[in-house]
Amino acid sequence: MPRLKTRREKRLRRHKRIRKKVFGTPERPRLCVYRSLNHFYAQIIDDTIGHTLVSASTLDPEFEKITGKRGGKSIKDAEVVAEIIARRALEKGIKKVVFDRGGFKYHGKIKAFADKCREMGLEF
């Protein structure tokens, strides 16, 4: 009898499938997102050398200055993280990225994050 798959297992399978196709280069690094139960994380990675170029999260001190709270799990908090990472990327001269949604469905916080990044000037 087949075992029921948990949400986490399904997400990890989607993530593996996406990672086979998505690869960050120096010209077009990978914008990777992770959504935990209480926080939202994003980083821009150059996969050729395996370095994180830019990162932001709801634990970032700049996030705390903007929102007045440490941590957050709402859609608005994901948009604030998008503003922070987009600004930092543009300061480093990164305009084009490949979006890696980390196996999460393109919905809710992930969609709001991506839309805000595009609005701030990042090209996917």
From Swiss-Prot:
Q: Which Pfam families match?
A: Ribosomal_L18p
Say yes or no: keyword Transcription present. Answer: no
The UniProt record lists the keyword RNA-binding: yes
Q: Which GO terms describe its biological process?
A: translation
Task performed by this protein: This is one of the proteins that bind and probably mediate the attachment of the 5S RNA into the large ribosomal subunit, where it forms part of the central protuberance.
Q: Give the family from UniProt.
A: Belongs to the universal ribosomal protein uL18 family.
What's this protein's name? Answer: Large ribosomal subunit protein uL18
